[in-house]
Amino acid sequence: MEEWDVPQMKKEVESLKYQLAFKREMSSKTIPELLKWIEDGIPKDPFLNPDLMKNNPWVEKAKCTIL
């Protein structure tokens, strides 16, 4: 590790204190909640629900052509 001067060390300590203050939760709890949130949003997500893409006027209708 390279030599650090005092301001760099202070910034590093400040950053570590900031990270330590974050509220953390167990992955075993948050991952199922995230999956449920994603699954609940599928009917409203135009990228996952092709019927919603049909109503979007900005979607390109033509396919790409390779020259």
From Swiss-Prot:
Membrane topology reported for the UniProt record: Lipid-anchor
Record has Membrane as a keyword: yes
Molecular function per GO: G-protein beta-subunit binding
Q: Which domain of life is it from?
A: Eukaryota
Which PROSITE patterns does its entry note? G_PROTEIN_GAMMA (PS50058)
Record keywords: Cell membrane, Lipoprotein, Membrane, Methylation, Prenylation, Transducer
The Gene Ontology CC terms held by the record are: dendrite; heterotrimeric G-protein complex; membrane; plasma membrane; synapse
Oligomeric state and partners?
G proteins are composed of 3 units, alpha, beta and gamma.
Q: To which protein family does this belong?
A: Belongs to the G protein gamma family.
Q: What is the name listed in the Swiss-Prot or TrEMBL entry for this protein?
A: Guanine nucleotide-binding protein G(I)/G(S)/G(O) subunit gamma-13
What is the native source organism of this protein? Mus musculus (Mouse)
